[in-house]
Amino acid sequence: MEAPPAAGVPTECTPAVAGAEVRCPGPTPLRLLEWKVAAGATVRIGSVLAVCETAASAQPAGPAPARAASGGCVRAARTERRLRSERAGVVRELCAQPGQVVAPGALLVRLEGCSHPVVMKGLCAECGQDLTQLQSKNGRQQVPLSTATVSMVHSVPELMVSSEQAEKLGREDQQRLHRNRKLVLMVDLDQTLIHTTEQHCPQMSNKGIFHFQLGRGEPMLHTRLRPHCKDFLEKIAKLYELHVFTFGSRLYAHTIAGFLDPEKKLFSHRILSRDECIDPFSKTGNLRNLFPCGDSMVCIIDDREDVWKFAPNLITVKKYVYFPGTGDVNAPPAARETQARRKVNHSSKGGDALEQALSVRDPEDGRPAPGVEHSNGLGKASRELNGGEAVPGVFPSKADEKEAWPLTRASPASSSSGHEPTEAPELPVSCEWDGRTTPGVQPTQGDAATQDLDFDLSSDSESSESSSRSEGQRAPAPQERTKAAPEHSGPQDTSGGRAAASPLGESGPSIHPHDKGSDLDTQEEGERDSLCGLGNGSVDRKEAETESQNSEQSGVTAGESLDQSVGEEEEEDTDDDDHLIHLEEILVRVHTDYYTKYDRYLNKELEEAPDIRKIVPELKSKVLADVAVIFSGLHPTNFPVEKTREHYHATALGAKVLTQLVLSPDAPDRATHLIAARAGTEKVRQAQECKHLHVVSPDWLWSCLERWDKVEEQLFPLIDDDTRTHRDNSPAVFPDRHSVLPTALFHPTPIHSKAHPGPEVRIYDSNTGKLIRMGPQGSAPAPSSAPLNHGEPSSFRAVQPHQQQMFGEELPESQDGEQPGPARRKRQPSMSEAMPLYTLCKEDLESMDKEVDDILGEGSDDSDIEKKKPEDQDNEQERAPKPRKPRAPGIRREQPVGLPSSGERSTPGMRGPRGHKRKLNEEDAASESSGESSNDDEEGSSSEADEMAAALEAELNDLM
């Protein structure tokens, strides 16, 4: 029988940890026969507290022998009953003795309610109560107050413990670390130890690159391990307890951890992903849960400071970039928006609307529509990527694994063994055969090549390194590719081989590059496009099962698609990143300094225990302790220098930042280093005259930060010709290093040496559009309207010495004995020759001219031409004796009637500006109209004709 709730039972607003009282139930008295619990015992709901008996004639008062004298009628009426608890808790006090008769409603037991110190997915691990299904009388949900608020297990955020128990566990962890002389190291993945991209770069070597998929239909991910990564982890693991903390998804984090630590000796279960993050924009919120006693023994390495809120125990790592155009694929949304302004990312895969607007989720990490950014290497919906509606802490079951990973299945032995997935020979991912590309894969590689041209890298050094790596590596030979194919023909299978062949379908020698490539590529792209728009469809269902696959799928779903025989023949990898070597030295210094102070603390030489949050800034501030720096050109003059990144890191390294340049070597506030962005500023010119002042580039400061050491200033000199280099590379300026004086880009008129016979020239009436004259070009030289000075330097269109060979076949040969003059100067190249990309070719222009001539010449007939001939003769005879000023070049009117003239602008090598033809037609029309008026008006004097001609000439000269 269950005791009814007494008056002392906690109400809805009373905390569950308050004491509860169990009273005697029913309207009849009970005799207590036996207690089933003792003081301090833990009871659950339904646990038996005591065994009682009831008697109808039993009297609650009087001595026991007197009550027993009533005889067997009482014994016959009594019935044993079990008193059960309807609450969980700990027995605080037993309020009755065995054999005592308890009146109805009398107090029997005082209980201390369960505080639910350990809760797993809403169930109390102590009392078993479901804390999510309690309903109050009025229908509102009544959730008992639980003290379990701390999640201490990395990959199981649903397991909560109380703060008291968390502190107890935290103290035990600290004692264990002190016994083992270790510290804690929080390790970031993306752009710290690895670099991941969705883009396949066939030009790059496959050495050290893992190719894998996180799910069926998901895009292939390519991960490159940073050089010296595994050696770094193995050495540091002897001094630090390694914890992984990444903004990638849980499956992504465990997969990468399987590459770095296949035997699970380095990280074990200490892997924290985005799915367990309390704050999606910061990593500091989880430190309180993981280390309830404080993070005084925790050191952090990450390439970004903002996600840690510039924590003092953070060691900033140089960003690792191997794939050009890709930053941190798992950066938080705030960093995506920043990186989207600097990058242009065109991807062929679709994504959700949020990620299309935010670009990268790293660094360095949304996507600009219609492209796709590499958020965690997946085209998932934003709700799932941020842990919206997906159930955290779950993984596909083994039944669903066979369906979800058909292309990456492997035996459990291969994944659980201590060997890396690179030991079995596999098919290479790239599909080049005999120097040709598989037709089905060619569009994908073409897109990748287009993306390489559109990407805007964050720095020039990264761009140059990536381009040099791409150029220096080649694809494996076709013979080596064919050798690897028969090895997969048997029933044996490896995870790496499946993962490597997954982009192409099923692995095996049956794949032919010409008959299967197109179909497989079409099928793959169709699956990707259809699955990328599903939102929370199959992926949510896949994550809503169980998390029992944490350790298995990291080795099953992915593998390094490297054929060892192919890798031996490839060129050496040109990735010379050695930052982890310097980072190892820094971590060793931190570890040594900590335990040196800890030993002194044990000997009571120090009053307080050492703290990593004080040791890291202390060691860092000694790097540039004797340096005073001043900045030039790194930030706008109206921007406070204290808010710049250079000022933050310079002061963190111990340098003193000055704002005024003091040139006196004896001044106490003089600067020792000038960090300038460009040469030519006033500060740089003054500093270069001082021998005691080092003028360096900003790379010197970043190198000191990366190594925690003062590097040599001679390695980072300030380049003096930064401005000149930028001016020469400008597309708007033609390079002319031989000219000294500033010159104009274009001359008003071209200068021709002499006339050359051309095919033909046609002259049309500007008013009627009819053909006036056509014929071969004459040999009369064209006078120059504005001859150049001989001493004038060459301009944009002048032929440079290195360009004379280019135009040598078209330059006229000078005659012997002739004096050089304006008419004999070598011609300048035309627009089509100097800038061929900005003009049409000669054949196109000639075909356009002929087409226009045919259209305009259809209406003209022979009578019109013959009618114009006597008028032209009269006009030329009248104008012949008159003194004339030199005409603009390219205008010819001195041709006799019988000899048709030709213009030199039709000559391929002598093409002039296009406006000359229009101006020639205008002059012809004006001359003809003036000739007609002179014939009609015989009284007009010659002086008026001269004035009109002079005015016309002046107007033409102004136009030219």
Swiss-Prot record:
Main localization, broad class: nucleus
Modification after translation: Phosphorylated. In the presence of TFIIF, the phosphorylated form has an increased CTD phosphatase activity. The phosphorylation is required for the physical interaction with GTF2F1.
Gene Ontology terms: cellular component: centrosome; cytoplasm; midbody; nucleoplasm; protein-containing complex; spindle; spindle midzone; spindle pole
InterPro entries: BRCT_dom, BRCT_dom_sf, Fcp1, FCP1_C, FCP1_dom, FCP1_euk, HAD-like_sf, HAD_sf
N6-acetyllysine modification, residue list: K770
Keyword set, alphabetical order: Acetylation, Cell cycle, Cell division, Cytoplasm, Cytoskeleton, Hydrolase, Mitosis, Nucleus, Phosphoprotein, Protein phosphatase
Residues annotated as domain FCP1 homology: 178-341
The keyword Cell inner membrane is annotated on this UniProt entry: no
Compositional bias segments (type: Acidic residues): 453-463, 566-578, 854-864, 934-947
GO molecular function: RNA polymerase II CTD heptapeptide repeat phosphatase activity; Tat protein binding; TFIIF-class transcription factor complex binding
Any single GO BP term: exit from mitosis
Record field: compositional bias (Polar residues): 439-448, 547-556
The UniProt record lists the keyword Iron: no
Phosphoserine carried by residues: S530, S664, S730, S830, S860, S863
Renumbered residue ranges of the record's region Disordered: 331-580, 770-834, 854-948
Compartment annotation: Nucleus; Cytoplasm, Cytoskeleton, Microtubule organizing center, Centrosome; Cytoplasm, Cytoskeleton, Spindle; Cytoplasm, Cytoskeleton, Spindle pole
Catalytic activity field: O-phospho-L-seryl-[protein] + H2O = L-seryl-[protein] + phosphate; O-phospho-L-threonyl-[protein] + H2O = L-threonyl-[protein] + phosphate
Domain BRCT: 619-718
SMART domains: BRCT (SM00292), CPDc (SM00577)
Modified residues (N-acetylmethionine): M1
EC number(s) stated in the UniProt entry for this protein: 3.1.3.16
Quaternary data: Homodimer. Interacts with GTF2F1. Interacts with WDR77, SNRPB and SNRNP70.
Biological role: Processively dephosphorylates 'Ser-2' and 'Ser-5' of the heptad repeats YSPTSPS in the C-terminal domain of the largest RNA polymerase II subunit. This promotes the activity of RNA polymerase II. Plays a role in the exit from mitosis by dephosphorylating crucial mitotic substrates (USP44, CDC20 and WEE1) that are required for M-phase-promoting factor (MPF)/CDK1 inactivation.
Name the UniProt record assigns to this protein: RNA polymerase II subunit A C-terminal domain phosphatase
Organism: Mus musculus
